[in-house]
């Protein structure tokens, strides 16, 4: 029965992807019906803010993005620092420590939601609502705006206006869908209140303080926007965030909704729907392989316990919630790292070595399917590399969407693709070379190495999940992961926007018999191979020293 539920869940992922992709294309490219519904409200916003809506160059678009996001980071930083004297603080929580406030503000603006604090006792309701939830809408709206400009550039059109795209992402996508999802979560038992904690009497007569808050509205945008941060420290393992299997499936659907839709949006906007389908199917195969790997490992159980003759038919249940079980915990772990959300319904630090390797690889690739917007930019980056390599092998100038890929584009892509591993491995080496980093490690040996690398991988990929055995709420970890999140977020977005702007100016080369097609199975296979060879092999030495070595040791 459990496998039937898994198949149905995956079919739902597939069935909603195309309709959502069509809706996104209409939402951003203009639709009379949508303009009639949302237009008056958007015009009011533009009038108040003074947005003119003129087309921007890629530099103007990028500058608008950085300035708006930077302003939001500063505002939210001071909210966190001053929450102790601000209203909506029934628990009388004090202001955040400076480096933690720095880390948290960047974390949520970068759509990472790395949390070095426990939500229920680290933030006031005001900080949760005005600080955290606000950024949970603003961060994915930023990247969705960027990806629309990126696709327009690839299609040879004007990039558009950042502020118009940002507003449309909020009004036409995130606000309406999150509102509906929040109502469903309330119906499923997720609390939504501004009241303080309630005191309950336990079975043995003791008194217990049960924390609550505006959780349903928080969870809906947490999953839809691929944010992933928890209202509670336990994240989606907490029964108030994720009461049962229905809420669990809904959360996974929300996480996958936009990342799986974007290939179809792309196909429609560039006039090659088949290429969008090829990208979707290719990535789903990689996703499926990851799920099968982690599930097989977790169901097989802990090799040490197996060697002792201890029977555990449910597999490795350490760190997992009984109400979800091993299979759905494995699926959730695959989804949350494939969609770069970072929400967890099981503790990733307790996964088996190979089970923990799958989320780690998903984040290292940062492209299966990746988070809202940013992940799709990486997908096209790998697609262009696949075309470039194929062109070199046959001695032909590579073309993508009928436009020649030349030195300028490949230099930008080369720098972008190297920057991701440089952040992860460079900062991991720094942490391992100083006691400021190693003192946080709770496990010696191979697993300790994986804890460190996982933290920086999660930060660079804007995921936010963690091997929570790491004691990371220290100035060193707060500052270094904050820098990695910021650089990992904005560097690739800006460089790939420059690539799109460069391709926009090029004339379309007529298709000939020798043109390498990017809308068939051959390209899909080369695309997957490029992701594995260029992406995964970059990190292979580290994977051997970490989870693979731990697996062989346990064996």
From Swiss-Prot:
Database matches in Pfam families: KdpA (PF03814)
Database matches in InterPro entries: KdpA (IPR004623)
Membrane topology, as annotated: Multi-pass membrane protein
Principal localisation: membrane
GO cellular component, one term: plasma membrane
One Gene Ontology term of the molecular function aspect: P-type potassium transmembrane transporter activity
Cellular localization per UniProt: Cell membrane
Statement: the UniProt record of this protein carries the keyword Cell membrane: yes
Domain of life from the UniProt record: Bacteria
Keyword field: Cell membrane, Ion transport, Membrane, Potassium, Potassium transport, Transmembrane, Transmembrane helix, Transport
Positions of transmembrane segments: 2-22, 60-80, 130-150, 173-193, 246-266, 278-298, 374-394, 412-432, 483-503, 525-545
Family the entry assigns: Belongs to the KdpA family.
Function: Part of the high-affinity ATP-driven potassium transport (or Kdp) system, which catalyzes the hydrolysis of ATP coupled with the electrogenic transport of potassium into the cytoplasm. This subunit binds the extracellular potassium ions and delivers the ions to the membrane domain of KdpB through an intramembrane tunnel.
Subunit structure: The system is composed of three essential subunits: KdpA, KdpB and KdpC.
Name by which UniProt lists this protein: Potassium-transporting ATPase potassium-binding subunit
Species name: Bacillus mycoides (strain KBAB4)
Lineage of source species: Bacteria, Bacillati, Bacillota, Bacilli, Bacillales
Annotated gene: kdpA
